[in-house]
Amino acid sequence: GGEPLVRPGIVALTRRLAGVPGIRDLSMSTNGALLAPLARGLARAGLRRVNISLDTLDAGRFKALTRFGDLAAVLKGLEAAAAAGLGPVKLNVVVVRGLNDDEIPAFADLTVRRALHVRFIELMPMGAAGFYRDSRRVPLAEMRSACPALEPVPPGAGPEGGGPARVYRRPGAVGSIG
């Protein structure tokens, strides 16, 4: 658990993991804050893909949600990962009513010019009270309606490692949404 990029020697560890017989695909999930200076080295070490957890594109919200609070560092990490060939870069976005559900179109817009795969994830309610209650969950159908003009991507034509997600694309977009 935890953020892998804070581990000293993460590039060397990645190289060792990539060299294990039978491992054909190596990916990493990260908050992206430390990714920019490490992306090229990780790619050279054998990392193939990254998943970046990013729940807002608003700097003020980002600062309130995270301890490090530097949205610009995460966005630089996203660009560095793409430039290093760690792709498709996937953004995991947990959509929460009243927190970031108004940003669904902005996240979808990121896919127009970038080879990103934005994955909108439903909030998993935990308990009857508190922040993670069911009333904050945004159903898939509601997320989908916030992104008009999406076309389904044929099965098998979506991003590698996409799992069971339904994948869509805006007409003419480089990236995809799932």
Residue ranges and their predicted role:
Residues 109, 113, 120-126, 130-178:
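Auxiliary Fe-S-binding modules of radical SAM enzymes
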Residues 1-4:
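Glycine-rich, proline-tolerant flexible connector loops at the mouths of alpha/beta enzymes
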Residues 7-111, 117:
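Radical SAM/AdoMet-radical enzyme domain recognition
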